[in-house]
């Protein structure tokens, strides 16, 4: 598995792209563990999310997993394409972002090399 260098990664297997707009998604590791997503529940636009706290969920043919916010902030947009076709989240996890956020607090996260090592141990 490879992880793009332009993102930071959480221990909850989510990525955050610190660019404009700031986007959040799941990692390839999470996508493989889930298999094929069949339902995605994302935070509402305008809602506040807190780093390390559940803010939605993704349901697959195998299981249901919480989406845990990698940063705190206000949700600016959700990816309607992923809501309409949840399989996008697991088919191409590094392209299929879930939501955009205005960050108010960004905890220390891992770069791609550190996350790759972390994922190999998981």
Residue ranges: model-predicted function:
Residues 48, 66, 72-74:
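Beta-solenoid/beta-rich acyl/carboxylate-transfer cores
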Residues 34-40, 61, 69-72:
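Short, solvent-exposed beta-edge and connector elements
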Residues 75-91:
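Short, charge-rich, low-complexity interaction segments located
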Residues 1-54, 87, 91-122:
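Acidic, low-complexity mobile loops and tails
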Residues 59-68, 85-87:
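Short, Lys/Arg- and Gly-enriched loop/turn segments at beta-strand edges
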